[in-house]
Amino acid sequence: MYTLKRFGQHWLNDGAVLDRIVAAAGLACGDRVLEIGPGLGSLTARLLRQVPVVAVEIDRRAVAQLQRQFGGDKRFVLVEGDILREALPEPANVVVANIPYNISGPILAKLTGSLAQPIRRFRTIVLLVQKELGQRIAAPPGSRTYGALSVRLQYLAECELLFEVPSHCFTPPPKVDSAVIRLTPRPFALQADDPAHLDALVTRAFATRRKMLKNCLKGWVETEKLLAAFASLDISPDARAEDLSVERFVQLSNRLAESDYPSGAARGDRRA
């Protein structure tokens, strides 16, 4: 079956890589997997060897092939539709998928939620994504790729880049390399008192990279108040956004939000 560009289709055909993806999920008795965009069913077949699978597929050609291939297996449920419009299947507690790169962001948001409304229903989420995106998601503080996306997702889940997948493992080969990431949603050891404030802080902090944080937040919070918060948290007054860990961002947000919102602050303001 030929691929359709509008669906961002690239068939993963390397058996060793497929096996590593399944292994990364650590599947156990009682698990039920949500697979997004199963395509030709190469990953589906391996998942079904261990656990039941609920698959969501938008391409009618793939739906017909999957029904022929797995329709007789009672542990396989196929939903024809758009994952961004469909409700997440209730029984599934694990996600394993090779997702379309052109809608990776919306899919991640669908699976993990937002800072204000996190989704914790999945035990683990294993996704094949564009390598650059995987690096940004799992980036540590101080690294070149650490940014607003890193902070938001690492607040919601433990984020790991497990291994890279070269383009020749796909048909047709994408123009970029890929990577497998694992997200483990977690109860928060450090909870933001006001997630909307944290979201706005992160957005403004990373609006201009390499700029000192106190300058990024100028006009949003009084400099005197900001420097006092820095001092109380042992944050350098010359710190940049990329220097702060997720925990530090939460602590700073909590400290700044102890009083009224600073003049001009927008709840949930997102520009990054």
Curated annotation (Swiss-Prot):
Q: What is its EC number?
A: 2.1.1.182
Record keyword S-adenosyl-L-methionine present: yes
* Entry keyword annotation includes Protein biosynthesis: no
> Which GO cellular component terms are attached?
cytosol
What is the protein's major site of localization? cytoplasm
- Keywords on this record? Cytoplasm, Methyltransferase, RNA-binding, rRNA processing, S-adenosyl-L-methionine, Transferase
What Gene3D superfamilies does this protein map onto? Ribosomal RNA adenine dimethylase-like, domain 2, Vaccinia Virus protein VP39
Q: Which GO terms describe its molecular function?
A: 16S rRNA (adenine(1518)-N(6)/adenine(1519)-N(6))-dimethyltransferase activity; RNA binding; rRNA (adenine-N6,N6-)-dimethyltransferase activity
What residues does S-adenosyl-L-methionine bind to? H10, L12, G37, E57, D82, N98
Reactions listed under catalytic activity: adenosine(1518)/adenosine(1519) in 16S rRNA + 4 S-adenosyl-L-methionine = N(6)-dimethyladenosine(1518)/N(6)-dimethyladenosine(1519) in 16S rRNA + 4 S-adenosyl-L-homocysteine + 4 H(+)
Superkingdom, taxonomy of origin: Bacteria
PROSITE patterns recorded: RRNA_A_DIMETH, SAM_RNA_A_N6_MT
Give the UniProt subcellular location, in the record's own words: Cytoplasm
Q: What processes in GO biological process is this protein linked to?
A: rRNA methylation
Q: Which family does it belong to?
A: Belongs to the class I-like SAM-binding methyltransferase superfamily. rRNA adenine N(6)-methyltransferase family. RsmA subfamily.
Function description? Specifically dimethylates two adjacent adenosines (A1518 and A1519) in the loop of a conserved hairpin near the 3'-end of 16S rRNA in the 30S particle. May play a critical role in biogenesis of 30S subunits.
PANTHER family, A to Z: DIMETHYLADENOSINE TRANSFERASE (PTHR11727), DIMETHYLADENOSINE TRANSFERASE-RELATED (PTHR11727:SF7)
What name goes with this protein?
A: Ribosomal RNA small subunit methyltransferase A
Originating species: Gloeobacter violaceus (strain ATCC 29082 / PCC 7421)
